[in-house]
């Protein structure tokens, strides 16, 4: 199964509380921090809601 590398490219400060919560739950703390998450519907949904704050790369196993 493919995985996604998610990088926070813009700050979550001054954003809606829901968007800040999503950033925190994905494990992103600071600008330019990255996490690797499984490519599933839940992760894709979270990325969709904060797509203007993150960049996503697909990592193939």
Curated annotation (Swiss-Prot):
- InterPro entries attached here? Ribo_uL30_ferredoxin-like_sf (IPR036919), Ribosomal_uL30_bac-type (IPR005996), Ribosomal_uL30_ferredoxin-like (IPR016082)
Among SUPFAM superfamilies, the record links this protein to: Ribosomal protein L30p/L7e
Q: Which GO terms describe its cellular component?
A: large ribosomal subunit
Q: Which cysteines are joined by disulfide bonds?
A: none
Write out the entry's keywords from A to Z: Ribonucleoprotein, Ribosomal protein
Is the Ribosomal protein keyword given for this protein? yes
| One GO-annotated biological process of the protein | translation
Pfam families named among the record's database cross-references: Ribosomal_L30
User: Which GO molecular function entries does the Swiss-Prot or TrEMBL record give?
Assistant: structural constituent of ribosome
Question: Family, per the entry?
Answer: Belongs to the universal ribosomal protein uL30 family.
Q: Which NCBIfam families match?
A: rpmD_bact (TIGR01308)
Assembly and oligomerization? Part of the 50S ribosomal subunit.
Query: Mind telling me what this protein is named?
Result: Large ribosomal subunit protein uL30
Organism the protein comes from: Lacticaseibacillus paracasei (strain ATCC 334 / BCRC 17002 / CCUG 31169 / CIP 107868 / KCTC 3260 / NRRL B-441)
Question: Encoded by which gene?
Answer: rpmD
């Amino acid at each position: 199964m493919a995985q996604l590398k998610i990088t926070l490219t813009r700050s979550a400060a001054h954003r809606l509380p829901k968007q800040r919560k999503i950033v925190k739950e994905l494990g992103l703390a600071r600008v330019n921090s990255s996490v690797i998450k499984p490519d599933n519907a839940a992760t894709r949904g979270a990325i969709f809601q904060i797509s203007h704050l993150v960049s996503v790369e697909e990592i193939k196993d």
